[in-house]
Amino acid sequence: MLYKRNPQLNKNGELIHLLSTEGLSKDILTHILDTAANFVSVNDREVKKVPLLRGKSVFNLFFENSTRTRTTFEIAAKRLSADVFNLDIARSSASKGESLLDTIANLSAMAADIFVVRHSESGAPYLIAQHVAPHVHVVNAGDGRHAHPTQGLLDMYTIRHYKKDFANLRVAIVGDVLHSRVARSDIHALTTLGAAEVRVVGPRTLVPPDLAQMGVRVFHTLEEGIRDCDVIIMLRLQNERMSGALLPSSQEYFKSFGLTAEKLRLAKPDAIVMHPGPINRGVEIDSEVVDGPQAVILSQVSFGIAVRMAVMSIVAGNEA
């Protein structure tokens, strides 16, 4: 019954694919975060390796460009002692018209164990997960506007590291929520982990009208949206996904929704500032904030390796 409801889980309720934070229980999310905590120290060792995925093959399939996410997945897999293969999509058979599932079938024939997939089409990792063998696992590295679960998880790890508990937290997610798969993954994870209040802040043109159904409060002014918040997650303006005149200009956006040191004082004195990257200084956030003591953006990047190690080690230990 559980497997039919959630394709990420096997019949025992164990994680076999990571496709979205939506539908994952608090216990599963906490298990991933706890496992990641055990891997953080690996990054500080002289020999930065553990043998958990020795003999396993991890294929990074990035149909969208990425530097940070692909690199951290590669580092994570290598630190688990896996063999890692980065498919050059621009030169692959996919660029010659081969279908997504045919590409997966051919790579599966090469004894792939884990596919890490980033794709511009929402649902592509789900499609792949439905067609792989029981011992093969799929990790979603971002699909369209839909989800970016490992970013959501590393955001949760970062919040827990600095704030210890979600129960009394007021969290604001600010910016281009309409096009953000990170925002959706964060919202699902925050509500499941019991954050006291999740706010979404942005111009009306960049905030989906149905967000209130996800249990969040919507604000259309930055000052009100971040007031008394414990955590502020800034989002990049995704101009490459925009069509039409959703914004007057980047300069006008910064005036209304750019986070400056002055505006940050409206949040709690010990508030932390996060950003999934890449950062556009002077558009969504001022350099003084990025380089200031309340920004934990580089910690997010560092913790991302441990979180992705946790995800791959957990799914690899379970079968459909």
UniProtKB/Swiss-Prot annotation:
Output one GO BP term: 'de novo' pyrimidine nucleobase biosynthetic process
Bridged cysteine pairs (disulfide): none
Q: Which GO terms describe its molecular function?
A: amino acid binding; aspartate carbamoyltransferase activity
Which UniProt keyword terms apply here? Pyrimidine biosynthesis, Transferase
Question: Transferase among the record's keywords?
Answer: yes
Report the family membership.
Belongs to the aspartate/ornithine carbamoyltransferase superfamily. ATCase family.
* Biological role: Catalyzes the condensation of carbamoyl phosphate and aspartate to form carbamoyl aspartate and inorganic phosphate, the committed step in the de novo pyrimidine nucleotide biosynthesis pathway.
Return the NCBIfam families for the record. asp_carb_tr, PRK00856.1
Q: What is this protein called?
A: Aspartate carbamoyltransferase catalytic subunit
- Native organism: Delftia acidovorans (strain DSM 14801 / SPH-1)
